[in-house]
Every structure is written in structure tokens, then in C-alpha cells.
Amino acid sequence: MRLEDIKSPQDIKGLSYAEMNDLAAQIRTELVTTISKRGGHLASNLGVVELTMAIHRVFNMPEDKIVFDVGHQSYVHKLLTGRYRTFCTLRSFGGMSGFPKRSESEYDVFETGHASTALSAALGLARARDLQGQHHHVLALVGDGAMTGGMCYEALNDAGDSHTRMIVILNDNEMSIAPNVGALSQHLTDLRVSSGWTSTKRVIRKGLSCLPVVGKPLQRILSWAKKSVKSMFVRENQEGFFNNLGFHYFGPINGHDLKALEHTLEAVKQLDEPVVVHVLTKKGYGYSAAEDKPERFHGTPPFYVETGTARKKGTLPSYGQVMAETLSEMAKTDEKIVAITAAMPSGTGLSYFAERFPRHMMDVGIAEEHAVTMAAGLAAGGMKPYFAVYASFFQRSFDQMIHDVCMPKLNVTLLLDRAGLVGEDGATHHGVWDLASMLPVPNMVILAPRDLNELRTMMRWTQENESPCAIRYGRESVDLSARYPAQDKPFRIGEWELMEQGEDVALLAVGSMVAEAIEVRDLLEKRGIHAALVNCRSVKPMDEKMLCQLANRPIVTMEEHVLTGGFGSVVCAFLSGEGLPAPMLSFGIPDTFVQHGRRDQLLKYLGLTPELMTQRIVIALKNGEKH
């Protein structure tokens, strides 16, 4: 069967295993071909081809429900649910999302993008089913490190305690599937999933419990013997862990053996209890470049299929690279510096630091809340912790930031990567709410560099800082030093940089928007409008003195952040509180979730390109002249 002919999962239910193997090869070819052009999450999807096929053959979607944790491994699911024709638009502006999207298909029952949420969502779906007297199956596919997140264990504890019927598929792609271990564990699994074995276990357990005196001791002896034998083949005795939480454990299963997967899933369908199916898969399976470097192809830019090398490489280092290099230089002379990541050493750039200072590098897993409070403990103990995290993931640690860092005024530095619009990953990954969460919090210092050089300057300043501090920077690197060299005077918080004079209007830009504001000023100059240009690098505290001096002309604020609660709203509140009646125009992100697409496309969509902002400023100035 051709992949392009699949309209729904029903189309693959009657295929032979030979036909299914051919279909798996087609899917892998499509994944590699499309992602090589569009970018995206390749390694994880290559690893779940057979698993996703088995799920759709055994269960009846969309009546049965599946929640994909993180959601980045849902590409195969999309291809099997009639979306082949639009798959070529993956992650493009107006095209298919790289994550499950309820508006995209009835098969996408729950939207995900951040880790460790699937079990809680699936439990909610299962309880909704039970409360309404329905009988369909609810599955959660979780893996790729998401089990390091605390939410998973909260959900497991709740589901096991309530004995809610649901199926958790643990996609374990950290273990290799050695033939001998795989064969032995598969043999044990075959025994355990057979209906006869399951029934026999129940009968034996019931019979032993009825025997006077010797019944319970015999039960304990047999249980001990079973666990001893199983522990030889099941690594780290996962069975006991999940059983203790109230789940029936199956596995480990070879995640690339379609027959074994279907056999197991057919069996667990019959159980009226919470179940964990432990599946072993190999990231990047079927494409050698991704198999050899799975982390490199976890989330990849467009690449050449033949070599696996990126199609386009930037000429500038990333903000993460500059951050890590600067932090490493600082650590050479300061033994108190500690770097922290939440399972993203490569994405944040901290792999560089880890190679040089392994004892001072801490990867806490997908546990942002824990990371912040642990950093607070480090600071209370006399260390200087730096937590590098994507701005969108930092949202999870809002309470810890207030309660554990800012209230005691501890010296924790947050390095907020991907602040602003991140591009093709879309709404779940845009870092556009961090300022709104941090600006109201006492003791917090918030900085936003205009370019790579200013990031270096701010990083070095933090060595002398004793307050909670956040430095936010975008995904796309900027270097403005050719036109605007770094100032000679030392960096100080509460001071802005007046980059250009101008009496007609003042442009106040934050971080990544400084580059856009420079172009706006140039366009205004061509129209005879002279604009002051200000780099508002110290977002909190603001440069109140300079702001008061600029308030004798219209004020325009520019930020790659939501308008509500952002920099512009704080400027407006300050001017109002001081009784300064300067007309204001604020540019930022409106009250909407921004879709996926290239940053330049999204800026245009939001009216934040230099040309569109200039038009609005000119109109506003003309309207102001009429009053």
C-alpha cells in the first residue's frame, strides 16, 4: 500500500506484516525527506514508526484516544491519520504544526509541546470517559526523558491510587535492544500477556489466599521467586516500581517488532486497570546519520540527506555559545560558579561549559521547578548558580522564582534563551510571557542585551551582582558592533543606552527589537522625522531619569513580548504615575497565541517589521498634530 493512499488508520488494519514493513520504510523515507527540507524532530519520530503503526492497528482512533507527551514524536501519527498531502508543509507558516493540534484533526485529542503532561491529560480523559459511562481506551505515549518530570509521577500516583483504566506506553529510547536480552525478555512477556497466564495467575493467587497457615507464606515465596527471575532480564526492576504505584507492568518490548507490539497491545486492551507497557526503541532508527548522532537530530534544522550536515549555517555564534564561552571564562577565576540545565545542555549551549567544568555542571532533567529551588539552595550555600533555560519552559517555575529566589533575595542568575518568537516550533515554544511574570516581582533584576557583545558584558556584570537576575535573549544572533560599538563606560543596572538623539519621537526598544528599531529610525529619517533611539537594556530597574527626559515627545516602545504586562505597560504606568502626559504607542504581541513560521514571517503577521511599524508611527504622529 502507498503511504499517500492512507486516509485513516482503518486503511492499515488489514495489511500483512510484509506490507506493513514496506509501509514503515515509506514512512521513514517521507520523514527524512520532509524534515531535511523543513527541519523538525527527526530522531524521535524515526524511533516510533512501528510503535505508532501498532497502536493504530490495535486501537480504534479517534474513538479511542491517545495523548503524545511533548508531541514532537507525533509525525507518524499525522501520516497515518490522512495528513500525507499536507505533511510537506510541516512547521511552515500557515502549514501543518509540528505538534498535535486539535484544530488540525479529530485524531489530535490533546495539544502538547512541553514535557511530562501526557499522563495527567490522559488520566483526565479517562475519568471523563468513566463519568459519562463510555468505554473507549485512553493511551498516553511518554518518553524522551519526560519521565524525569515530576508531573509524570504525580499522575502515576493518582491514577494508580484510583485504579483508573488507562494505558501508559513508556517509549524508552535510552536502552539498546541486545538480541539476547530482547529474546529472553520477549519470552517472558509472551508468557505474561497470554490470557491463559493472566487467568492462571489470578486462580493461583486466589487459591493460595484461601489456604490456611501456609497460603500467605507460599504467596510471598512465589512472588519473591518471580521477581528474582524477572530482575535478571528486566533492567532496574521497573516492574516493581510501577506495580507499587498500582499499575500492571508489561515489558520491556522490542519497539521495532511489530508483531510483538501488537500482541502485547491486544492483551492489555482486555485489562480493566491502569497499565504500563515498556517499549524499547532506538532513536533515529533507519537513518544512519540520526542513529549515530540522535541528539543532533532530535530537533534539527534543514539538512542534506546524503551527509546529515545542515543546509545553512549562520556566520555568527549563537547566543547560547557566547553565554557558555563567557561563563566558562568567568569560571576559570571564580570557583563558586555553577551552571544548571533542565535536560538541555546542547540547546542552551552549556555542553561547552560541561566539558570544561564537569563538577560544576548540573543537569537536573526535565524539572524546571526543582532547578530553580535547587539553584536557590546553591546560592544560600555560598555558590553562584546560573540556570540556562528556554523562556517558554521557565514558565513552569514561576512560584519557585518568587518564593524561593526573590523573597530571600538570593543570587540566582536566570539565562532565558529563546526569549521572543522562536519560529517553526510555534505557540508552545514562543518565549513571550517571561517579562509579564517577572516585572511585578520585587528584588528581580531583568536585563535584555541588544546583541552578542552586550550579552558578554551583562554576563560579566553578574559576577558582582547579589540580587536575583534574569538575562533574556532571542534565538537569532545579532551583532550591532559595526555601527554601534560597545560603550567604554561600565555597565550599570537602571541605565539605558541612548544610541541616537532625536527630538520628534523617542523609540524605546528591548533586546531583539533594538535591531528593528534601528531600521525604523532610518526610515523615519528619510521622512524628515528625527527619532531618539534608546536601548532599554535594563528592563528592571528602568532608567527613570532618562525616561522623564524623553517624556517631552511621543514615546514608542518595542518589545518581542506580549503587550499585556510587558515593558510598554510598565513604561505607561510610570509616566502616568509621574503625571507625564507623553503620547504613547506600544508595539508587541497582542492577546493571541502566535502560530508557527519563520521569525520574519511572524513579525510581518504581527505588524512588527520596520516598514509596518514606521507606517503606524507616521500615522500616529500626524493624528497627534491634528489635536
Set out the residue ranges of the language-model regions.
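Long, well-ordered, tryptophan-enriched scaffold segments
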Residues: 3, 174-323
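Peripheral docking tails and interdomain loops at the edges
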Residues: 302-306, 310-313, 423-425, 434, ...
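Generic long, charged, amphipathic alpha-helical segments
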Residues: 363, 521-550
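Non-catalytic terminal/interface segments that mediate subunit docking, oligomerization
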Residues: 65, 281-395, 400-410, 467, ...
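N-terminal amphipathic, basic-rich helices that act as targeting or association modules
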Residues: 1-79, 243-247, 254-261, 278-279
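Cofactor-binding active-site loop characterized by glycine-rich and histidine/acidic residues
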Residues: 41-162, 337, 341-342, 350-351
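Glycine-/acidic-rich phosphate or pyrophosphate-binding loops and their flanking alpha/beta elements
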Residues: 263-266, 298-299, 308, 318-333, ...
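Structural signature of the thiamine diphosphate
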Residues: 216, 220-289, 411-416, 435-484, ...
